[in-house]
């Protein structure tokens, strides 16, 4: 049995009083983050324990903080600490103050278990039959999502409540025990990602890039134009922002659905999956095709393949970033170094005269590398 962390996202339907409390919670979470960032703005890291020690005094000075879940005060500090850690590792810029208008409205609360008169109580409870979730301070809220899910098997760890496109959502993190099947690999596949075709497989199959951004691009441009002309603080501006957020939400959902469809099919049909290890940040830096790369969502696709492989007992490998998969002839291994121009889609091997299609050739080379990795691991295990 293997323990995994799984997230279930539901849409919430709070009452007016619950909405007020949610908005207060978002505001206080942002206030705590900004308060301790202001005190540590010129530092490279923060001491979260020292910040937590200062909380009781801060609550005394601001009585309105008692109205919300006390857990979100600490998690806001933990989020700030994570931001500083990412900054110190060079993964992001220095943490910035959160804006009331621009920053994402969200907070996280942990599930706290307590015992009273022999009964066990959890601060976060989900009833899928009645379609209700119980959250600290908010009591029960109606939820919707996962039509076929009858019961969540596992321990609820925490819940992240957020607002997106004027709708409220809760993402529940659950620790589950998963029985991973032991399989004997019978089929392997190599995958090459691209812009025109999001995936080319070593079997010669190409999966088209839906280019979701093209469907919504004109609408986004039009709404942004109206937004620029609207008066700050006006009702009309608020309506435009709401419409814009809805369009972005649709775009995000369309991308994710398509990627889940692709990854599910690949995992179902294959036992060894190999793809490239990509450095997306480097590829998009000052690149004329950066928008197309972001729209293709390669990182999300690879991430899905990785965790789904683990859950299903499949084997997932990534070849080195600088492995010349497009330059090597899969037939004889000859390397043609003059193939840096992406416009060259077909080339003839000078060594064996084999005609190679760029993407299919690359995916076959990636497949061979994956098989080599598998055999190497098997020999080391013996």
Predicted regions and their residues:
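Non-catalytic, well-ordered alpha-helical scaffold segments
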Residues: 20-23, 27-30, 34, 71-78, ...
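Stable alpha-helical structural segments in soluble proteins, enriched in small hydrophobic residues
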Residues: 36, 72, 76-87, 360-370, ...
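Long, hydrophobic, amphipathic alpha-helical segments used as structural scaffolds
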Residues: 37-44, 84, 88-95, 176
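Acidic carboxylate diad motif detector
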Residues: 53-164
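Positively charged, helix-rich recognition surfaces that bind polyanionic ligands
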Residues: 150, 164-382
